[in-house]
């Protein structure tokens, strides 16, 4: 019995000490995830700090595998960088009954300037009734952080990836 307890404790400590991402060194990201452009999100979305929370949650959940870069422009940094941009965001704007809230990010992983992976992730809340504009986006940021960490374990290249892909029409038609 004692061996099982010792082994269990050792397993947990090993798991906590091991980074949650599959990279040789720490992956550098921006301390605040930027919006792709000025058209992304409404004034309500831009009042929230969910993009800083998204970065912080990715760093926290990576267990040392992801760190905040010393500069916001990652393109000139050596090593492994993950550029993430918010390409879509929606939150409450018409009172408590404003439908689902969502966020979409696109990300590109580079090792010494060479693209080694890229991906797009979208999360949607299922709670149409909320009095908070920022609360649902915080929950979406938490879910997106988990998605980023899961993808970093096995990054892949999407041949159809484009930063400026116009998903507005396709998503609006699906809603």
Where are these regions (language model features)?
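Surface-exposed short loop/turn segments
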Residues: 65, 70-116, 122, 126-131
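A structural "domain/chain start" motif
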Residues: 3-65, 120-121, 153-175
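Short secondary-structure boundary motifs at beta->alpha junctions and helix caps
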Residues: 39-46, 114-158
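Hydrophobic beta-strand residues in large extracellular and virion-surface proteins
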Residues: 27-29, 58, 82-84, 107-109, ...
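Short, low-complexity, polar/charged sequence segments that are solvent-exposed and flexible
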Residues: 46-52, 101-106, 140
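Short alpha-helical interface elements
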Residues: 109-111, 132-134, 165, 169, ...
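Short, charged low-complexity intrinsically disordered segments located at boundaries
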Residues: 83-92, 137, 170-175
């Amino acid at each position: 019995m004692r061996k099982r307890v010792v082994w269990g404790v050792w397993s947990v400590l090993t798991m906590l000490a091991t980074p949650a991402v599959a990279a040789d060194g720490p992956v550098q990201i921006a301390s605040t995830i930027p919006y792709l452009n000025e058209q992304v999100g409404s004034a309500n979305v831009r009042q929230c700090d969910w993009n800083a929370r998204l970065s912080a949650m990715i760093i926290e959940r990576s267990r040392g595998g992801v760190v905040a870069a010393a500069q916001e422009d990652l393109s000139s940094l050596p090593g492994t960088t993950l550029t993430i941009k918010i390409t879509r965001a929606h939150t409450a704007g018409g009172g408590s009954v404003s439908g689902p809230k969502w966020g979409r990010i696109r990300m590109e992983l580079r090792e010494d300037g060479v693209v080694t992976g890229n991906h797009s992730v979208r999360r949607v809340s299922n709670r149409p009734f909320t009095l908070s504009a920022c609360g649902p986006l915080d929950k979406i940021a938490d879910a997106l952080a988990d998605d980023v960490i899961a993808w970093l374990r096995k990054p892949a290249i999407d041949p159809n990836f484009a930063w400026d892909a116009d998903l507005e029409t396709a998503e609006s038609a699906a809603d």
